[in-house]
Design a protein with these regions (language model features):
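Hydrophobic anchor residue at the start of the ABC signature
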Residues: 170
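H-loop/switch region of ABC-family ATPase nucleotide-binding domains
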Residues: 217-218
Length: 248
């Protein structure tokens, strides 16, 4: 895969002395700089802190330290402020955090963007209502692009396979049109064909939209497939950064 050198790019996300209180994860003192436009992988053994980093930055678990995005400090412990700053997160917990299982694919894809950015809404005077046509269009665009196997955009998320549910989580994040995307264990529990598609979708999103991506995965081989650099986390701290081509 084509590994790009972003060493001259500016730092878009700067993490200093991050600690996170997340069950089963140690995050004690993480320093990390992410370059604009790159795909940075975060790898390491289970429980060593890699999952704690995005969950802490995005405010899902109590965290401390300092995080700056695009030169401005980001308030920790506030998911909404992160979303307002154009950061998005595809969680490893797709059934707990990721999906509204009893809602349609349309509602899953469009709801966060409606809630956070007032997208897909029509207004007249004091009245606001959903722009059903825009919601239908955006959902079908991602069903098509991500090859989500479903009976249609009105199908409930619960009825999809794990791989297709994961693609809906990606579509939901893509619909926010973020500048920065954390994606955690994106291929966990899905079949090989769906894995390749998910990785390709992330790479395409990064290349075409210029979105900076940080991907957390236990699969080093997977990180090597799409990342430009790989940060290894051990014992709750950064243990070094490797170029993706010789991270063996």
């Amino acid at each position: 895969h084509d590994i790009r050198d972003h060493s001259d790019a500016r730092t878009i996300l700067s993490i200093r002395k991050l600690w996170v209180d997340m069950p089963g994860e140690i995050v004690r003192n993480v320093d990390l700089d992410v370059k604009e436009g790159e795909i940075l992988g975060i790898g390491g053994l289970a429980g060593q802190g890699k999952l704690g980093i995005p969950n802490g930055v995005m405010g899902l678990y109590e965290a401390g330290g300092t995080v700056e995005f695009d030169g401005k400090p980001i308030a920790l412990n506030s998911p909404r402020k992160c979303l307002d700053s154009q950061l998005a997160f595809v969680s490893e917990d797709r059934r707990g955090v990721g999906l509204l299982l009893d809602e349609s694919l349309e509602w899953n894809v469009a709801f966060p963007a409606m809630q956070v950015q007032n997208k897909f809404l029509k207004r007249m005077g004091f009245f606001t209502w959903r722009d059903e046509k825009a919601i239908h269009t955006v959902t079908n665009r991602y069903i098509d692009e991500l090859q989500i196997k479903c009976t249609g955009s009105g199908q409930k998320a619960r009825e999809l396979s794990g791989g297709n549910q994961q693609k809906v989580c990606l579509a939901k994040a893509f619909a926010l049109e973020p500048r920065f995307l954390f994606v955690s264990e994106p291929t966990r529990g899905i079949d090989v064909g769906a894995k390749a598609l998910v990785l390709e979708a992330l790479k395409k999103f990064n290349r075409e939209s210029g979105v900076t991506v940080v991907m957390i995965s236990s699969e080093l081989e997977e990180l090597r497939q799409i990342c430009d650099r790989i940060a290894i986390v051990s014992g709750g701290r950064g243990a070094g950064i490797l170029p993706a081509d010789h991270s063996s």
